[in-house]
Amino acid sequence: MEFKAKFLKLTAGLPLVMLNKNAAEEMGLSTSDRVSLETYSKPPKQISTIINLVDKIVAKGEIGVSDEIIKKLSLKEGEKIEVVFLPPSKSLIFIKKKLNGKALSNCEINEIIQDISNNSLSEPEIALFISAMYERGMNMKETIYLIEAIIKTGEVLKFKAKYLVDKHSVGGIPGNCTTPIVVPICAAAGLTVIKTSSRAITSAAGTADVIETIANVEFSMEEIKKIVKKTGACMVWGGSLKIVPADNKIIRVEKILNIDPESQLIASIMSKKLAVGSKYIVIDIPYGKTAKVDLKRAKILKKKFDYLGKYFHKKIRCILTDGSQPIGNGIGPALELMDLVKVLDPEQTGPKDLEAKSLMLAGTLLEMTGKAKKGEGTMLAHKILHSGKAYEKFKEIIKAQNGNMRRLRFGNFKEDIHSKKKGKVVEIDNKIVSALARLAGCPIDKFS
């Protein structure tokens, strides 16, 4: 059917269309039905999405389109477009199969991920898939299929470098912002680091959230190549790239659900590393009573990453670290940035636990690449850090990402809370600390 495009003048974060409710009902359509939009241009441009029904915003014969669709189809206001109503996705059958505890085939997982990437599944349907993974889990074959399917939906960054390294944490520990310290240490040592990070899913701040307090984190592939050629490293948000679009859409729903299934966590990490061509990878797996995983699960995760490293021909080193309590002094993007700058700047004194962990992780990469002898990596990392070279490299990266250290600011409100009892702190609940920071506005409000 033919409709006129009406600009909704809104950015939804995903392709969004609206149809007049009465007109849709006459056609037998309901909210969450699937449609394909195609232009009459040569060559035609096409996008699939889910419809939303409204009473007044859109008239009969019109289709309301968000900014994402306008950009994708290069539309003009009032332009006529062909709208085809699509049958229910086969993916729903496969998602129900996983909910019933059955293993999915390569083709079935590919179908689901392709539909997520093509906007053929609604957010509630993606949530159902995430819940199925969370409740039923995935075996190693399924996880590999998931990794490969996620990579297929996006582009692969090709960058020539002798030592292309990466570091990732499974997360869950407040203040565990070691990446912005590890990256400049490694870059100052002559290693290349293309660090694509997520924004926070269940925590108060992800690496991208922290860096975004003082610099841009959204760049195109070509812009990233220029930054890395100039500085040897970058710290950017993976969601702005086209490398793993399906993963980004899954993460968006994970944030709403506040859950991060193990199979998806592994697939998310591995797909990003493979898509940017990382050869040497260190994975930090914090464990503890209120961490994402306990020691038993941490050991299982390590075995899985070790297996995947061999399967995909990558050198992966998993390090199990103490996740019994938060790291550093501040929780949230701005406060964590302040902590890491104090660690990087030789003229300031930063949190010792944050420094020690960062040096250990950076030292591991230095040893893996042969930049340091076995057992001497942490010592070399310490030397680079305290010489000021890492801080200079950090500032160089921030400048290349159109940043400025002066952009850092803090929230207007603060309160000192004193205990009514005397005693010693014997335990800190990571999840409660993260929840408090999120209630204060993190990570959306970077300066809370």
Task: Enumerate the language-model features and the residues they cover.
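Acidic, glycine/proline-rich low-complexity segments that act as flexible tails and inter-domain linkers
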Residues: 86-174, 213-214, 393-400
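Well-ordered secondary-structure scaffolds
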Residues: 101-106, 111, 116, 156-158, ...
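Alpha-helix C-terminal capping segments
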Residues: 180-192, 272-277, 312, 368
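A glycine-rich helix N-cap at a beta->alpha junction
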Residues: 210-234, 303-309, 313
